[in-house]
C-alpha cells in the first residue's frame, strides 16, 4: 500500500490517502511492474482484511459508478477524495510513486497475493 498526506478538497485539513501500489502483478494476462490501481470496484477478502488500518478507504456510491468504487475519504469531514486528483496528473501523490520525493509516499507491504478489479496506472517512459 502507498500512503500520502494531502489537504482535503472540502475542509482543507490534512488527511491520509492510500492506493494499491504493485511492484509486480498481472493485468489481463500481461505482466506489469510498478503500477497503481484506482477506481477499484471489487477486491478479495485478503485485501479487505489488510485494509483494516485505513478505514477512510471504503466503498462509496457515485453517480457514474452505480455499484460504487472504493475511494479515500477525509478523516475529518468525510468528503470523498477523488482518485483523479491522486493519480492522474504530475504532482499528484500517486502519479509516479517510484520517482516521488523522499518522504512524500509511505509504502506498507501487503502480505501474500491479493486480487482486485480496477484501473491500472503506470508511467510510460
Q: Where in the sequence are the language-model features?
A:
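Long C-terminal interaction/binding lobes of large macromolecular proteins
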Residues: 99-125
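Short cysteine/histidine-rich metal-coordination sites, predominantly Zn2+-binding motifs
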Residues: 23-34, 87-100
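Short, charged low-complexity linear segments at domain edges
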Residues: 39-60
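Short, non-ligating residues that shape and space the ligands of small metal-coordination modules
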Residues: 17-18, 80-84
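Short linker/helix segments within small regulatory modules
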Residues: 23-24, 59-69, 89-90
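Residues immediately within or flanking Cys/His clusters that coordinate Zn2+
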Residues: 5, 71
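Long non-transmembrane domains of secretory-pathway and surface proteins
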Residues: 11-17, 21
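Short cysteine-rich clusters marking metal-coordination/redox-active sites
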Residues: 8-11, 74-77
